[in-house]
Design a protein with these regions (language model features):
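Bacterial N-terminal signal peptides that target proteins for export
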Residues: 1-11
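Conserved positions within compact, well-structured domain cores
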Residues: 28-235
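C-terminal motif of bacterial Sec signal peptides marking the signal peptidase cleavage site
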Residues: 18-21
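Bacterial signal peptide processing site
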Residues: 23-25
Length: 235
């Protein structure tokens, strides 16, 4: 009888260890949920956690929704006339927010804001206060501390980013929206929250194709691009 009790205790212990081990392995593969959305820990130096999917997407390979920089709603047309922070003055569109250069602002307007405020951050607006858009510095960290492999998932091309800990995220080549068209779907173009201060009409983006990958500051704020959210909050 004592032997049977001992065997039972051992078996129960093994079952507990096995179940705990499975749960841990599952988290490594699928990510961890924060406010109903999954993040993946890529082992980055800053500890920044990257979302598994784009804003508006259900799966990693889905493109998701497109937003002008600093806007939190989708729309049918992406141009300067429809852009939230532009006003037509004399013969060109001028900025009325996120401007450090008087020559670019309406009537010489400047506010010296160079990073999106929380109310203009679509990741926070859509997913809650524990999520936000990445900065240009965080895109650089991502690029420098992961392998970027061009691949295909379920017929969608993009980059598989793998961190030093073996965890990965997939970022599809989404293209961008200009006027009422989706164009350049062989490119991945993802907004950061950082203004391009040398060119006020643009903001920094992660840009990649099947050959190159870099952080680019030439994409105009009025065009529609996708967003991959980040978090610094571990459950």
């Amino acid at each position: 009888m004592r032997f049977i009790k001992t065997i039972s205790v051992v078996l129960i212990t093994l079952v507990i260890v096995f179940v705990i081990g499975c749960k841990k392995e599952k988290n490594n593969v699928t990510g961890v949920v924060v406010e109903h959305h999954e993040y993946v820990d890529l082992g980055l130096p800053s500890g920044t956690l990257w979302a598994k999917c784009n804003i508006g997407a259900d799966n990693p390979e889905d493109f998701g929704d497109y937003f002008a920089w600093g806007e939190t709603k989708t729309k049918d047309v992406y141009d300067w006339k429809q852009y939230k922070y532009s006003v037509f003055e004399e013969d060109s569109y001028k900025l009325n927010k996120y401007c450090t250069d008087p020559s670019c602002g309406v009537g010489g307007f400047v506010d010296n804001l160079t990073v999106l405020e929380s109310g203009d951050d679509v990741a926070r607006a859509e997913w809650g206060e524990n999520w936000r858009m990445p900065t240009s510095e965080e895109f650089n960290e991502l690029y420098q501390n992961t392998t970027f492999v061009w691949t295909e998932i379920n017929g969608v091309y993009g980059r598989l980013l793998t961190g030093s800990n073996g965890n990965s995220i997939f970022m599809p080549a989404t293209g961008f929206r200009l006027d009422d068209q989706l164009i350049c779907t062989g490119l991945g173009v993802y907004w950061s929250s950082s203004l391009q201060t040398d060119c006020q009409v643009a903001a920094w983006s992660l840009h990649f194709d099947d050959v190159n990958c870099h952080v680019c500051g030439t994409y105009e704020r009025s065009r529609g691009q996708v967003v991959r959210a980040v978090s610094n909050n571990r459950p």
